[in-house]
Amino acid sequence: MARYVFITGGVVSSLGKGIAAAALGALLQARGYRARIKKLDPYLNVDPGTMSPYQHGEVFVTDDGAETDLDLGHYERFTGRSANQQDNITTGRIYKNIIERERRGDYLGATVQVIPHVTDEIKNFVLNGNDDYDFVLCEIGGTVGDIEAMPFLEAIRQLGNDLPRNNAVYVHLTLMPYIPTAGELKTKPTQHSVKELRGIGIAPDILLVRADRAIPKEERRKLSLFCNVRESAVIQALDVPHIYDVPMAYHKEGLDSEVLAAFGIDPAPKPRMEPWQKVSDRIHSPEGEVTIAIVGKYTGLKDAYKSLIEALSHGGLANHVKVKLDWIESEIFEKEDPTPWLEKVHGILVPGGFGERGSEGKILAAKFARERKVPYFGICFGMQMACIEAARSLAGVEHASSTEFGPTEEPVVGLMTEWLKGNMLEKRRETGDLGGTMRLGAYQADLAKGSKIAEIYGDTQISERHRHRYEVNIDYKERLEDCGLVFAGMSPDGVLPETVEYPDHPWFIGVQYHPELKSRPLDPHPLFASFIEAAVEQSRLV
């Protein structure tokens, strides 16, 4: 039977509960255990699919097509386990399920209430599908004291009683701020956060305390006394230079040992930390540096590109180099010459996005990369803009555009009205709802033998995750290929273009899917490893 670790946060938000859960999952796996991580989000949206990147950051897409919280990306990258729809739930989805059941009469006329109906729905989500795992880690979104989080906290309180004795452990992540005028770290915010948690009925077993400097032993003893936690269970979580240093740092502080001790597991299997030590060594001892320009439209909030940033760093790890990112708002190129911005970079990446704003700047970035022979990686929207650039500049299609931007006489990119999902035909209308109406999740693609991308993958059949409504129009395939832009990857039915490339360019590849979602520090995605390798070669020419 699985054991459960519930991770809550206090004092302030954005302390890194997701990283803490992911790192703990990695540490348990390093000891040979099977770990699963779930995220419980208190917001009322059914999923983050229609939320603004500025509000929520990246939407992480799973193989089964779920649009989820970006923390699931951390879970996958740290543990290597692919997440699915059953690893993320929101208040919105819970209420939607309950209301649908009430309308069907499933509650047999009972008054539907937060307790027990909402809390039971949460508990069912936590407990379902865990037979193959030794540990299930559940991160509760938000901060203790938030009104939105109350049903979730009540549910995990109840689970502490529902589960067999010693099968639930509560980890509370807090902040210990340093007050410069007093010259000391303060314990009071953590004390009050734990008091709030205990008032709900949850007594934390472990305190994971964020701080920007070492916590003195006396302060740890104080937290132990006032928060009713063993002194050894007051774990300092100090700031580290890189997130992939976190597993080693938490292991050094004894987090995984303390969790296992709380479950009464003694002796515990010894961890195999060599892979994480290797990652840390490569991060801090690079053999060179490359600069990659990210030409995007959400550059003001880096969380909108979280998986992309991580995948580029994985490509750096594979090539023993540091990857420096140069963030460029694509709208700038609509007013200024791109040359001064791009002539010194070693690679250009145009990521996914939605809408017309900044699109012309991305087209100009693709043109610069093509003409100057700079490595170019176009992802989703970035591939579409590269195709529009080729149509305009090489194929003479002067008014080439996308129907996403409005009616056009030359729809090089258009709305997908139908596609195969398994054995079912999915259909969409231009005026349909936005939520859940994209081509989502893992789809297969066939790569042309002898193509550059097939060589990179080492295979001609791949499966990658998608998130898009618009697609390059197959009707323009012949004209674009006549100009040198090869459609090297297609959907198995030969209808949807999946990848494009210029064979005579050092490295110019566009993909309709999102390879960044499957990259891991211990297993970098081949496209990112190859892109950074090409950037290393370019760095010798600049």
From Swiss-Prot:
Something else known: CTPSs have evolved a hybrid strategy for distinguishing between UTP and CTP. The overlapping regions of the product feedback inhibitory and substrate sites recognize a common feature in both compounds, the triphosphate moiety. To differentiate isosteric substrate and product pyrimidine rings, an additional pocket far from the expected kinase/ligase catalytic site, specifically recognizes the cytosine and ribose portions of the product inhibitor.
Residues where CTP binds: 13, 146-148, 186-191, 222
Residues annotated as catalytic: 380, 514, 516
Region (Amidoligase domain): 1-265
BP GO annotations: 'de novo' CTP biosynthetic process; pyrimidine nucleobase biosynthetic process
EC number: 6.3.4.2
PROSITE patterns, A to Z: GATASE_TYPE_1
Residue sites binding UTP per the record: 13, 186-191, 222
Gene: pyrG
Protein name: CTP synthase
Gene3D superfamilies: 3.40.50.880, P-loop containing nucleotide triphosphate hydrolases
CDD domains to which the protein is assigned, alphabetical: CTPS_N, GATase1_CTP_Synthase
Example of a GO MF term: ATP binding
Taxonomic source organism: Mesorhizobium japonicum (strain LMG 29417 / CECT 9101 / MAFF 303099) (Mesorhizobium loti (strain MAFF 303099))
PANTHER family: CTP SYNTHASE, CTP SYNTHASE-RELATED
Activity control: Allosterically activated by GTP, when glutamine is the substrate; GTP has no effect on the reaction when ammonia is the substrate. The allosteric effector GTP functions by stabilizing the protein conformation that binds the tetrahedral intermediate(s) formed during glutamine hydrolysis. Inhibited by the product CTP, via allosteric rather than competitive inhibition.
Binding site for Mg(2+): 71, 139
Family of the protein in this entry: Belongs to the CTP synthase family.
Catalytic reaction list: UTP + L-glutamine + ATP + H2O = CTP + L-glutamate + ADP + phosphate + 2 H(+); L-glutamine + H2O = L-glutamate + NH4(+); UTP + NH4(+) + ATP = CTP + ADP + phosphate + 2 H(+)
Pathway(s): Pyrimidine metabolism; CTP biosynthesis via de novo pathway; CTP from UDP: step 2/2
Residue ranges that the Swiss-Prot or TrEMBL entry lists as coiled coil: none
